[in-house]
């Protein structure tokens, strides 16, 4: 009897969460023009599907005005590319008191380890004020997956510096990267990552290639590939791609936005990506 009651209680809890989630979606979307009363009646029992048909173009949201929880909600409902645009930005505060700006660089681009699509990819507009080496020694052995920078970003930096509301909605995604100068690719599952040469420039230049696809933001005409630190100083920045011709360096982007490379033990700027 107790087990039956427990099962029923569990089912009721799931139903309450579903109803609350649907209610939140409807209340949020009603002012945007995406959902009206008829749509609600027709689709309330669907799996959060909203059929737009030939409805007028809805109002887009200003990313800066949305909480990370709201952004995550739109992403979870598959509405991210309807509510926001590539290039939209949102500032957030790190635990050290400094600020970074996150920019949407692509929709429906990255995948979770279970193969499901993760709908929004962000990259920080600025590099961190403090430069970081890719590795403590001058080697690219093991590639991004085995690097010091990857461990730092996904460990202490993620846990200690990012705001709790942002950490709560970041979804780990699979990133492919060459293991070293050879053609072997390995996958890593990352909460935070730096882009590959191909994700920035759309092709391999001095990397091994096949390390992800070109992000929409970087496809656009007149997009500046160069970046500045949080303090405004022009900065080099790391890419996660090992140099295809040696065992000591990784690819980077110089202050002018051109493809370059640096010894793995050199400290360079870090502009990181994440997905929601």
Residues covered by each model-derived region:
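Collagenous Gly-X-Y triple-helix signature in extracellular proteins
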Residues: 42-276
């Amino acid at each position: 009897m107790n087990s039956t009651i427990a099962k029923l209680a569990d089912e009721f809890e799931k139903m309450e969460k579903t109803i609350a989630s649907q209610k939140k979606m409807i209340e949020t979307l009603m002012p945007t023009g995406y959902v009206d009363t008829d749509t609600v009646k027709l689709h309330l029992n669907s799996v959060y599907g909203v059929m737009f048909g030939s409805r007028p173009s809805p109002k887009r949201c200003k990313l800066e005005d949305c909480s990370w929880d709201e952004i995550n909600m739109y992403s979870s409902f598959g509405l991210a590319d309807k509510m926001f645009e590539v290039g939209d930005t949102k500032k957030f505060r790190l635990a050290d008191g400094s600020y970074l700006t996150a920019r949407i660089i692509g929709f429906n681009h990255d995948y979770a380890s279970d193969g499901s699509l993760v709908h929004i990819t962000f990259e920080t507009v600025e590099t961190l004020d403090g430069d970081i080496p890719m590795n403590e020694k001058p080697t690219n052995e093991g590639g991004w997956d085995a690097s010091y920078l990857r461990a730092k970003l996904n460990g202490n930096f993620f846990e200690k510096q990012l705001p709790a509301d942002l950490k709560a909605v970041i979804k780990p995604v699979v990133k492919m990267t060459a293991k070293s100068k050879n053609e072997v690719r390995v996958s890593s599952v990352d909460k935070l990552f730096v882009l590959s040469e191909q994700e920035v420039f759309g092709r391999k230049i001095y990397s091994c290639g096949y390390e992800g696809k070109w992000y929409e933001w970087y496809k656009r005409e007149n997009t500046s590939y160069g970046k500045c630190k949080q303090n405004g100083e022009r900065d080099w920045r790391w890419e996660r791609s090992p140099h295809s011709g040696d065992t000591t360096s990784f690819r980077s982007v110089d202050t002018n936005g051109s493809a370059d490379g640096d010894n793995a033990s050199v400290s360079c700027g870090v502009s990181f990506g994440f997905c929601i």
